[in-house]
Amino acid sequence: MAVGLLALTVIVDRGQVLIAPVTLALVIGLMFGPLADRIERAGVPAPISAATIVLVFLTLISAVIATIVIPLTAWTERLPVIWARVQSILADWKDLMTTMDSMSASLQNALGQEGNAAEVKVDDGSAVENVAWLAPAIATQIVLFLASLYFFMATRHQLRSSVLGLCFDRRLRWRIAHVFRDVEALVSSYLISITAINIAMGACVAVAMALLGVPSPLLWGMLAGLLNYAIYIGPAIMAVIMLGVGLATGSSTTDYVAPMLAYLAVNMTEAQFVTPHVLGRTLTLNPFIVLLALAFWIWVWGPVGGFVAVPLLLIAAAAIRHVSPANHRRFALEANAEKN
């Protein structure tokens, strides 16, 4: 079993370019499955319904990216200011003076004086070259994702019928049908609910940042909502980002930590009260298992892994619920009880 898991990990890691976008498309397709069913019940053919959903999804994602990238690019120029603030704070700790001196020298070299202009140009050229090399691979993954999403949405009923047609045993066919039903219901319910929660939380973070006078409050609200898809890890990253924002914009210790504390207050309210109330007990998963899944999928697939980790756990839970031997016995007892 250990060898099989290791082999699966290697396959998932090495096949990221192919497997990651297809998996993401399947998860997104499960999310929009109920919407596609409603459109098709209105008499719209499945291919047109799938194309409509893909276009709407692509438009929304493009709008989100455009809203985030432009202000975020401007904020990257403040990184030297943030690092300088960190230096000035840590410099007050006498036991870290030696470390900070070396960091100061490294920072001055990285920022570059007039004589180091040529080095900065070389670094920029290298960055542009890296982007040029990565662009075709990224474009290929995007096209593969969109194509997979469209064809899955357009043919998902045929796929389900084909899989059920391979099951010659009636009881097995019944179980597999319930797996399909529960997978779509669980993943769709989870992603729609968590998306609504993240939008509301992002709006609250944006309002909080605006009240604190933090520049670009909409940016931080949208970023908080996006990172919240990767539970546990995403909020931790966002807290560090907000601390950096406070260091870049504040003038006192209170100003430094206020954005981070405001974000943590909103996030803790969402995590402790809103999410448990909205999702309920039906979608609760063991936090330790969730953390392990997040760590694993982020390790192999990065941000895409963070998004699909929980949906993949829900898919596995639905399959185990109907396929495990213990549930086989339970279903048999229920069937006998119904006959009697």
Model-based region annotation:
Residues M1-I70, F145, G165, L314-N340:
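Anchoring transmembrane alpha helix of integral membrane proteins
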